[in-house]
Amino acid sequence: MAKKPNKSDNTIAKNRTARHEFAIQDDYEAGLQLQGWEVKAIRNGKVNIAESYVFLRDGEAFISGVTITPLNAASTHVVADPTRTRKLLLNRKEIDKLLGAVNREGQTIVALSMYWKASWVKLKIGTARGKKLHDKRADSKSRDWARDKQRIMKHSTR
């Protein structure tokens, strides 16, 4: 029996609550300005983006609330701040679109996932609008119905 090819997943961390709490409109790929010890810690998977948020100041985008736990061996010569504010690397047009979405349309910017692209750490961010309780219930019902439908179709073809 042949083995399945090992599909390497480049995802480092996902913000699962973002898709539950927000309706995502658009998504963008942003680079992160990181220090050396942060890259080493990210390679070991010591990152959490669940409580993170993106804000715009002076025409630049920043992310706050990302927790990168420093490694004991890698960060001995620097004072490591695990929750420091990090700059996002975006094009001017992308920053202008984000600024328009936040100011005019009342949307917010949330971090969706962090992943490797070649040797670079990238962050997938999205403009989003908060969901109401009835929207969350409707999404839950539609997911349950889709799951039941698949189960029914699977058993009906036998």
Curated annotation (Swiss-Prot):
GO CC annotation: cytosol
Family matches, as SUPFAM superfamilies: Small protein B (SmpB)
Protein localization: Cytoplasm
GO annotation, biological process: trans-translation
Major place of residence: cytoplasm
Region ranges (Disordered): 136-158
InterPro entries: SmpB, SsrA-bd_prot, SsrA-bd_prot_CS
Keywords: Cytoplasm, RNA-binding
Biased composition (Basic and acidic residues): 136-151
One Gene Ontology term of the molecular function aspect: RNA binding
One Pfam family in the UniProt entry: SmpB
UniProt cross-references to PROSITE patterns, sorted A to Z: SSRP
Keyword RNA-binding listed: yes
Matches recorded under HAMAP family: SmpB
Purpose of the protein: Required for rescue of stalled ribosomes mediated by trans-translation. Binds to transfer-messenger RNA (tmRNA), required for stable association of tmRNA with ribosomes. tmRNA and SmpB together mimic tRNA shape, replacing the anticodon stem-loop with SmpB. tmRNA is encoded by the ssrA gene; the 2 termini fold to resemble tRNA(Ala) and it encodes a 'tag peptide', a short internal open reading frame. During trans-translation Ala-aminoacylated tmRNA acts like a tRNA, entering the A-site of stalled ribosomes, displacing the stalled mRNA.
Protein name: SsrA-binding protein
Organismal lineage: Bacteria, Pseudomonadati, Pseudomonadota, Gammaproteobacteria, Vibrionales
